[in-house]
Swiss-Prot record:
The keyword GTP-binding does not apply. Belongs to the bacterial ribosomal protein bS16 family. GO terms for molecular function: structural constituent of ribosome. GO terms for biological process: translation. Coiled coil: none annotated. The keyword Ribonucleoprotein applies. The gene is rpsP. InterPro entries: Ribosomal_bS16 (IPR000307), Ribosomal_bS16_CS (IPR020592), Ribosomal_bS16_dom_sf (IPR023803). One of its GO terms (cellular component) is small ribosomal subunit. This is Small ribosomal subunit protein bS16. Gene3D superfamilies: 3.30.1320.10.
Length: 75
């Protein structure tokens, strides 16, 4: 099973809100996931919370990080 850390969209139409999740790469964007490690709200200034220890753990065990997650967590 290839795991990936990516965003899943929640929230209303025209008002996005994202969870940072670990999931199987073959699953759809918003389908089942293994673990939620944080959230990101692009409409608010500096609204990003995630567990850096869990992100490091998943990277260590081989999970790939999506480009968008890598960009927002590197800030």
């Amino acid at each position: 099973m290839a795991t990936v850390v990516r965003l899943t969209r929640i929230g209303r139409k025209k008002s996005p809100f994202y969870r940072i999740v670990v999931t199987d790469s073959r699953k759809r964007r918003d389908s089942g996931f293994i673990e939620t490690i944080g959230y990101y709200n692009p409409r608010m200034e500096e609204e990003l919370k995630f567990d850096a220890d869990r992100l490091a753990y998943w990277k260590k065990v081989g999970a790939k990080v999506s480009d968008r997650v890598a960009k927002i967590t590197s800030k």
